[in-house]
């Protein structure tokens, strides 16, 4: 039995192993659909889908459309990652099988639910995941589709029994305008994906258009620390959309007078302080209408994560969850795969991995790392006979996409200056062909801190191990295959003679 629309009963997905596509496949399977798909290579996501009954072929050919008895009722693909001459898309056109994009499927799956959607240039996955975990702790069983794997759930998607659906609303190709949300969270708005939008103005406009799709009685939750999302909140509040409320959150030096409206935007929560502790931190904040501040301990690092927690709190409260229980859930949130994820520790060197691939994300992660080096790991304190000094931040950065590297090379360089030592790898091109003169060296030229350009990925682990000392934090950073270097760096640290490089 299936409760799916007829078109989604037998679905073939091109690029099924990707973060967004695999999540949709999980939900389709859980709702009784038949799913087939193809991907360029084996992955954990592909193996997990096969275990749930999906028929997946590695490589792309027209015969993949025959994996399901009777063939697919629809073929699903992503906006840009799949070339139009893909043999499966060509065969679908020949057979007259409709080809639709992933967001159209997600919009269909969300019908009949109260939808809580998280958008913004950065922080979508972490905030969405925090919101899901908080609601689950409160006894909700929401459906969700997230761009990363929740550490608690070990999955990026779920078909829940409740009437709430939580999802990321990806703005990269404007497809978020297919959704009709009840609650929208906007973490920040900063020009990106200009290869698609063409101008910063067009990129910003898509958020205005998205907010305009809020249903009557809906809520826009926006970060007031970010100029882009604050301006969006002001525009929406001034426009007076029928039945739509606007609620801001952000930083304040103290609680006194912190809840006066800011440029017409009501303030719902204020971050009073964030103090780094080991691999997490202590967050003090105050909610509008409450007399006293609240304090919670978080298991994820960085002031940006503290702000994300306030966004998740306000959205979960709007869904009907109890504030105290929401905070318990947020306190237990263990993070998302590849979002400042702890890889391991060797000889007093802590290694983390992060997906950051935009200058603002790089700055946020390196700021959190700087807090960490002033807070040595408890194990280092126990193992050292002498006080453990604070260390340095070493970042191994892999630029993602030639177009983004060409646009932001100088900004990446300035952002990487927040580290003490920088290694820049070559560009991970993903779907793009190389651009003349664009490589990791372009980014390295804009770094003023000690920098190493290393185009040979295989040489990086040994080189990083030679740079690191006890107390240091190493971060592998980028949206490509740099993630595989973390464990290799730990292996290199184990193999290296115990040494203390000069600083």
Curated annotation (Swiss-Prot):
- Protein name, please? UDP-N-acetylmuramate--L-alanine ligase
Q: Which domain of life is it from?
A: Bacteria
- Which source organism does the UniProt entry give? Rhodococcus opacus (strain B4)
- One Pfam annotation, family name? Mur_ligase
The EC class name is: ligase
Give me the reactions it catalyses.
UDP-N-acetyl-alpha-D-muramate + L-alanine + ATP = UDP-N-acetyl-alpha-D-muramoyl-L-alanine + ADP + phosphate + H(+)
Primary localisation category: cytoplasm
Among Gene3D superfamilies, the record links this protein to: Mur ligase, C-terminal domain, Mur-like, catalytic domain, NAD(P)-binding Rossmann-like Domain
Q: Which InterPro entries is this protein grouped with?
A: Mur-like_cat_sf (IPR036565), Mur_ligase_C (IPR004101), Mur_ligase_C_dom_sf (IPR036615), Mur_ligase_cen (IPR013221), Mur_ligase_N (IPR000713), MurCDEF_pg_biosynth (IPR050061), UDP-N-AcMur_Ala_ligase_MurC (IPR005758)
Give the family from UniProt: Belongs to the MurCDEF family.
- GO CC annotations? cytoplasm
Q: Which residues bind ATP?
A: 120-126
Gene giving rise to this polypeptide: murC
Q: What is its EC number?
A: 6.3.2.8
């Amino acid at each position: 039995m299936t409760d799916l629309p007829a078109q989604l009963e037998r679905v073939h997905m091109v690029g099924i192993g990707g973060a967004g596509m695999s999540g949709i496949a999980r939900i389709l399977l859980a709702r009784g659909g038949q799913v087939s798909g193809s991907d360029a290579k084996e992955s954990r996501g592909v193996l997990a889908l096969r275990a749930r009954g999906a028929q997946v072929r590695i490589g792309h050919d027209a015969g993949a459309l025959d994996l399901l008895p009777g063939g697919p009722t629809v073929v699903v693909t992503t906006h840009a990652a799949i070339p139009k001459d893909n043999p499966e898309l060509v065969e679908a056109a020949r057979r007259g099988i409709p080809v639709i994009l992933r967001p159209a499927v997600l919009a269909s799956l969300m019908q009949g639910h109260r939808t809580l959607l998280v958008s913004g240039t950065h922080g979508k996955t972490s905030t969405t995941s925090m919101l899901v975990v908080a609601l689950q702790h409160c006894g909700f069983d929401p459906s969700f589709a997230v761009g990363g794997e929740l550490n608690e759930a070990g999955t990026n998607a779920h078909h829940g029994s409740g009437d709430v659906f939580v999802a990321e609303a990806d703005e990269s190709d404007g497809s978020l305008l297919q959704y009709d949300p009840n609650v929208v969270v906007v973490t920040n708005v900063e020009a990106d994906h200009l290869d698609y939008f063409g101008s910063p103005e067009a990129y910003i406009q898509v958020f205005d258009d998205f907010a305009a799709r809020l249903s009557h009685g809906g809520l826009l939750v926006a970060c007031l620390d970010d100029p882009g999302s604050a301006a969006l909140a002001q525009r929406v509040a001034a426009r007076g959309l029928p039945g739509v409320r606007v609620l801001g959150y952000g930083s304040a030096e103290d609680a006194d007078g912190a809840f006066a409206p800011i440029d017409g935007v009501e303030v719902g929560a204020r971050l009073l302080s964030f103090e780094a502790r080991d691999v997490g931190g202590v967050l003090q904040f105050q909610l509008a209408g409450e007399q006293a501040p609240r304090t919670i301990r978080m298991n994820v690092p960085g002031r940006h994560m503290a702000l994300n927690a306030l966004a998740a709190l306000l959205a979960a409260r709007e869904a009907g969850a109890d504030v105290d229980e929401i905070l318990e859930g947020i306190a237990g949130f263990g993070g998302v795969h590849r979002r400042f994820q702890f890889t391991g520790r060797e000889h007093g060197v802590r290694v983390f991995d992060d997906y950051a691939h935009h200058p603002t994300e790089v700055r946020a992660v390196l700021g959190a790392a700087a807090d960490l080096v002033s807070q040595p790991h408890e194990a280092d304190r126990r193992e050292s006979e002498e006080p453990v000094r604070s260390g340095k931040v070493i970042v191994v950065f892999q630029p993602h996409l030639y177009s983004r590297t060409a646009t932001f090379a100088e900004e990446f360089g300035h952002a990487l200056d927040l580290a003490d030592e920088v290694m820049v790898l070559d560009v991970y091109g993903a779907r793009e062909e190389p651009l003349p003169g664009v490589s990791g060296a372009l980014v390295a030229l804009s770094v003023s801190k000690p920098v190493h350009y290393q185009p040979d990925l295989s040489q990086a682990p040994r080189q990083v191990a030679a740079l690191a000392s006890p107390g240091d934090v190493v971060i592998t950073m980028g949206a490509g295959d740099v993630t595989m270097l973390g464990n290799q760096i730990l292996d290199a640290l184990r193999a290296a003679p115990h040494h203390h490089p000069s600083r």
